[in-house]
């Protein structure tokens, strides 16, 4: 039976030390089939998922996708616009989907949410429970994601890029999609988040050289 996957995402690396807010005009917005048309063949994580889904003969149900360059805290209008569109579309399709696949950054901060992705995943979890629907929720994240317990507790799997610069972002999405495929076969998957005690300086996290090259 063909799997139907609801595909959406919001991607922003927020720099809270910047005073200027990031507004709706700063975001590139794709809705419905535009997500597939604008991303197919462009080498993005979304493109990676589209390719994997095609090979698996999955049906992609596109929702909303938003992305902006790294910048300041995201304003409330963006929150409202994204939430409204995402949950309206999810509500319309939720009875006929087998999974949710999300393209996220993992370090987005908005006016009302210090952990935007964690709060967003929690809202999805509550939505599905209220509908008495149980489907996997899988997300691909940026290497620089601030992975929170809330993200882990409210998702089936989050999988981050491994390289900096992010030359593997497309491959990471394919890997996340392959994990979703495995989950369809064996849904009893436990997700574990191992935290580090260290804060790594940006100058030391390039994965082409040591120490990160040896670690990874």
Report residues per predicted region.
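Active-site-proximal beta-alpha loop/turn segments in soluble metabolic enzymes
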Residues: 68-73, 105-110, 165, 196-205
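Charged, often glycine-rich, active-site loop that binds/positions anionic groups
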Residues: 65-83
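N-terminal amphipathic/basic leader segments beginning at the initiator methionine
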Residues: 2-55, 206-207
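Glycine/alanine-rich phosphate-binding loops at beta-alpha junctions
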Residues: 54-58, 74
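Accessory alpha-helical/coil subdomains and C-terminal extensions
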Residues: 45, 52, 185-216
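Active-site histidine-anchored catalytic micro-motif
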Residues: 6, 11-13, 27-28, 74-80, ...
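Short beta-strand elements in bilobed, periplasmic/extracellular small-molecule ligand-binding domains
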Residues: 57-65
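Short, charged beta->alpha transition segments
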Residues: 46-49, 83-96
């Amino acid at each position: 039976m063909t799997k139907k996957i609801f595909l959406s995402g919001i991607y922003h690396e927020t720099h809270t030390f910047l005073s200027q807010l990031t507004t709706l005009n700063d975001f590139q917005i794709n809705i419905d089939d535009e997500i597939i048309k604008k991303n197919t063949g462009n080498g993005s994580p979304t493109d990676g998922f589209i390719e994997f889904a095609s090979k698996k003969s999955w049906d992609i149900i596109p929702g909303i996708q938003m992305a902006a360059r790294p910048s300041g805290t995201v304003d409330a209008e963006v929150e409202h616009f994204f939430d409204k569109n995402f949950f309206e579309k999810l509500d319309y399709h939720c009875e006929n989907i087998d999974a949710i696949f999300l393209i996220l950054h993992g370090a987005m901060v908005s006016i009302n949410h210090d952990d935007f992705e964690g709060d967003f995943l929690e809202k999805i979890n509550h939505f599905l429970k209220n509908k008495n629907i149980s489907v996997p929720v899988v997300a691909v994240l940026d290497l620089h994601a601030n992975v929170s317990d809330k993200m882990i507790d409210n998702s089936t799997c989050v999988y981050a890029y491994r390289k900096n610069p992010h030359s593997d972002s497309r491959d990471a999405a394919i890997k996340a999609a392959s994990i979703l495929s495995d989950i369809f076969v064996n849904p009893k998957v436990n997700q574990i988040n191992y935290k580090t005690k260290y804060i790594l300086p940006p100058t030391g996290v390039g994965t082409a050289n040591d120490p990160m090259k040896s670690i990874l």
